[in-house]
């Protein structure tokens, strides 16, 4: 986590660099923060068209192993997805969070995969969030997300907040 001011200067961070360190990319208070460019194979999920989403899925599944987990594919293909969000997209599509690429392709669920992907990320484009804290039945917090999480069913208690800063 990196906190920056309006000019992208680092105010604080969860882990700052040492000035004398030999890190290629130093993270120090007062320095301008420049995020790393996205790897070429990972693209932003925001503003993604259905055609692009489906073409990328097909290209990946044509070259890989059909048993490859769909959530892992989403993590490798799109920047900014968390493992929780990737599993949630797959869960909303297939009813399980560990479905394979082949399972989704064989069951004709690719369009539904896109619709669930879009259902999570279209609100983000409009700065609409559903901050959600997930607790185990004993009250222990184990997940936090910007959107509703359904994959845990009755094994989790969801606590919704009005804003991300609550």
Describe the function of each predicted region:
Residues 1-166:
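Extended, highly charged segments
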